[in-house]
Amino acid sequence: MLEVKTISVEDTYEIRHRILRPHQSIEQCKYKEDHAEGSFHLGVFYDGTLISIASFSPQSQPLLTEASAYRLRGMATLEGYRDQKAGSTLIKHAEHKLAESGVQAVWCNARHHVKGYYAKLGWKELGEPFDIPGIGNHIVMYKTLRTSR
């Protein structure tokens, strides 16, 4: 059974490093926004094992018109668990949490090869593809949230 929990930023580093940035040092897996006011980190546990992580921080996106936005960063699921729907469970949980707190949109710089994954979750492309040196092609993806406020 999958369980989504708030985790510490330190709990994200191993999976971030292993899945997203294996060619970089663990220090390069730490983002300046990790400790920003309002930031939070979620993990999905399967039978007590942390299998999926993501970080969220209040950050506007110049191409978005929504006044209140959060950025998703460091989304990753361990290879052996990708058929468990941990990532989509995590994203849906975060979208609900953000909408409940009045956040109007969530966005990310998605790796180009996974943009279809976000599209299936109702996210849309924004702007033109771009390259992040050493990591690869990306596209901004976003979703407008239905707030309860």
From Swiss-Prot:
The keyword Acyltransferase applies. Keywords: Acyltransferase, Transferase. One of its GO terms (molecular function) is N-acetyltransferase activity. Its EC number is 2.3.1.-. InterPro entries: Acyl_CoA_acyltransferase (IPR016181), GNAT_dom (IPR000182). It holds the Pfam family Acetyltransf_1. Gene3D superfamilies: 3.40.630.30. Residues 2-146 form the N-acetyltransferase domain. Belongs to the acetyltransferase family. This is Uncharacterized N-acetyltransferase YitI. It comes from Bacillus subtilis (strain 168).
